[in-house]
Amino acid sequence: MKILAIKSSGDRTGISLMLNDEINSFTMNHDRKDRPNWDMFLDNIGHKKIFNLSEIDLFAFENNQNSFTATRITASFLKGIAIALKKPLISIEDNLDIEELVIIAKEKFLSAEDAHKRLSLIHISEPTRP
């Protein structure tokens, strides 16, 4: 299973990629008002070298209670990718290290007992049309 997870606290952002059971992560401190450069984060975990976004099975982000803006930015970025690729996106409520986040995302997704319950974990929806 291939999982991509992102967390941000506003002044520290991390990205983690799980390919089967191997985890590759990158974390960086930045000014609170700076928007993360997502291309740079993806490049640092091997995007277009060891994986492509279309190969990801599950996207996850941390719902960080310390920075609602950081959570909205992260969720919006991953939601756009997940919708475009028709892949699941889940939110993790715990305050975890980035490596732990990707592990918990996998466990949460796989622990769903049936397809209906898995669908309830997916936090993406199609945009409404007028």
Model-derived segments and their meaning:
Residues 41, 76-80, 94:
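Generic beta-strand or strand-like secondary-structure segments
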Residues 58-63, 68-89:
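DPxDG-like acidic metal-binding loop motif
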Residues 12, 32, 74-79, 83, ...:
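A generic structural micro-environment signature
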